[in-house]
Design a protein with these regions (language model features):
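Small-residue-enriched transmembrane helix starts and helix-helix packing motifs
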Residues: 22-35, 41-72, 94-99, 191-219, ...
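Membrane-water interface of transmembrane alpha-helices
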Residues: 72, 76, 159-170, 258-273
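Hydrophobic alpha-helical membrane-insertion segments
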Residues: 96-112, 251, 255, 287-304
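Membrane helix-loop-helix hairpins that form the core translocation module of multi-pass transporters
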Residues: 24-42, 96-184
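C-terminal regulatory/interaction regions
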Residues: 2-28, 233-243, 259, 263-359
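Divalent metal-coordination and catalytic microenvironments
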Residues: 37, 73, 105, 150, ...
Length: 359
């Protein structure tokens, strides 16, 4: 009996977990985020034991704050939002897009921080600004993120065109709600949508975003990476216990996964609701799809401009300007835009007859 129950359990809760009820998948995802927090602050607890270095509390909290700060970078927000939009348009309710992306993204700094704790001094040099390793990894990360966001942005732009044209008749309105956005694509950039579906078909489940997140992370923001590694080295020299030092990358990961998971779940709710109601919510669906597409194309342009500037050693004003743009915390502005759009349509929906009860 044990030989059959184990594969069944593995298939049910690992390979086929996308078939579980949404509430269960959300619960598993949030439980994983909670486990990361328990691990991070469990490691921190070793530094708070009698006679331990009190500096540990400050450095772990600093690492946690760095993880939260980095989760609101525009490329994070845009990648998670546009990927969520893709899955929802395919009839899925993706509960773990943000978690998988941030877990893969933070794995780079987690591995680097762990090697620093283990005494691998070459790691700090590899990430040093201007080093060959830093240059190559930065190009890989920028290339992957730029191309992925470009493809997603064009795909969602094609959906936006389809939605805009689909609003002309009641028949097309019902087709969007019944069959998802894919049916409406053919009314707009049908060829573009079909061409872009091919590469995007490789991303079939939210967990596959983990690999993309890791590749994005290879071009990790230099200041964030160096800052965390220097924090780890400094804390090590100050006598902070090794277990507490390991809490730094784990705390960084815990904070990033928390913020990105909540972002992914929030966008899933927004997009899913937009596809279930007529009138106001369908207009809301079209609006947020346009915002997602524009944000992805905007970030892709900046990222790829900087990529070609560094790869080819270009010195023209255009790519030089793009390479120098620091989006910083612009992701917070994008979240604010989505929130304002939602509030606007929520308010309008409450004022329209027959929509107050469903909003």
């Amino acid at each position: 009996m044990s030989t059959t129950s184990h594969p069944t359990f593995y298939r049910r809760y690992v390979t086929d977990r996308h078939t579980l009820p949404l509430r269960a998948r959300v619960g598993f995802t949030l439980a994983a985020v909670a486990a990361l927090h328990l691990l991070a602050f469990g490691l921190l607890a070793t530094a708070l034991a009698p006679g331990a270095q009190p500096l540990a509390l400050g450095v772990v909290l600093a690492a946690y704050a760095a993880g939260m700060k980095h989760s609101y970078d525009w490329d994070h927000i845009s990648a998670i939002d546009n990927t969520t939009r893709k899955f929802v348009s395919e009839g899925m309710n993706p509960a773990s897009v943000g978690f998988a992306f941030s877990l893969g993204h933070s794995l780079v700094v987690t591995l680097a921080g762990t090697m620093v704790v283990a005494g691998a001094q070459f790691v700090s040099g590899a990430f040093e600004d201007g080093s060959s390793a830093n240059h190559v990894l930065g190009l890989i990360g920028a290339g992957v993120s730029g191309v992925y966001l470009l493809v997603l942005g064009l795909y969602n732009a094609s959906i936006s065109v389809g939605l805009a044209r689909g609003r002309s008749t009641a028949h097309q309105h019902s087709a969007v709600g019944a069959r998802g956005d894919g049916a409406a694509d053919d009314g707009g950039w049908g060829l573009v949508s079909r061409l872009l579906r091919k590469p995007l078909q490789r991303v079939r489940r939210p967990r596959e975003i983990f690999v993309l997140g890791f590749l994005f992370g290879l071009g990790f923001d230099t200041a964030t990476t160096i800052g965390l590694l220097l924090l780890t080295v400094s804390a090590s020299l100050a006598g902070v216990p090794a277990l507490a030092l390991l809490g730094l990358p784990v705390a960084f990961t815990a904070a990033m996964t928390l913020c990105d998971t909540l972002n992914g779940l929030g966008m899933m709710k927004l997009y899913s609701n937009a596809l279930t109601q007529a009138g106001t919510r369908r207009r809301f669906n079209a609006t947020v799809t346009v915002i997602s597409a524009v944000s992805a194309l905007f970030v892709a342009t900046i990222t790829l401009g900087g990529f070609f500037h560094d790869l080819l050693g270009l010195e023209d004003p255009a790519t030089t300007a793009l390479a120098e743009i620091d989006l910083g915390q612009a992701g917070l502005a994008l979240i604010a835009v989505f929130a304002l759009v939602w509030l606007r349509f929520w308010w309008v929906g409450r004022r329209e007859p027959g929509t107050a009860s469903s909003t």
